[in-house]
Amino acid sequence: MIPGLIADDSPFAAQYLGALFSSDPEFRVLGVARSGTEAVHMVQGLRPDIVCMDVNMPGGDGYSATRAIMASTPVPVVIVSSDTDQDHVTLSFKALEAGALTFIAKPPGPTSPGYARTVKNFLATFKAMAGVKVIRRTHAGSLADAPYAGISATTNFRFPDPDPNFAAQTGNG
């Protein structure tokens, strides 16, 4: 059983998402948060295995709520949105930067073409993400700030000059 929390300020969307999760016996919805702040408090109290986090909510959007969750009570977060007008790649990077594991679109209604397949993929994503181990974020800097294998981001590293005979040796000359 995968206990999860839904964070969505729309009663209709929260009920719809709850019905999707309840349709799969592997999920159990622990509760619904109506704001980002409420989501953070509910995660601390309920300790779900996964959070389905809406982007646009009062009391802190899904990104700020995800940051707070990852700083206090790390748990896998999947950010979802029905707003498909924005660039999906941009939203995905914002979700990852906040600490979410992924960003996906909310499934369309049951009359949409491919509805069953879309819901199956949606639920499969949550099942996979619920098993991911997450840790508390203690440093908010960029990757360029972190040392890697003893080489700092400021080290003047230079690749060696290529072998002039390489192309001929590999038959690509």
Model-inferred region functions:
Residues M1-G173:
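Strand-loop microenvironment adjacent to phosphate/nucleotide-handling motifs in alpha/beta enzyme folds
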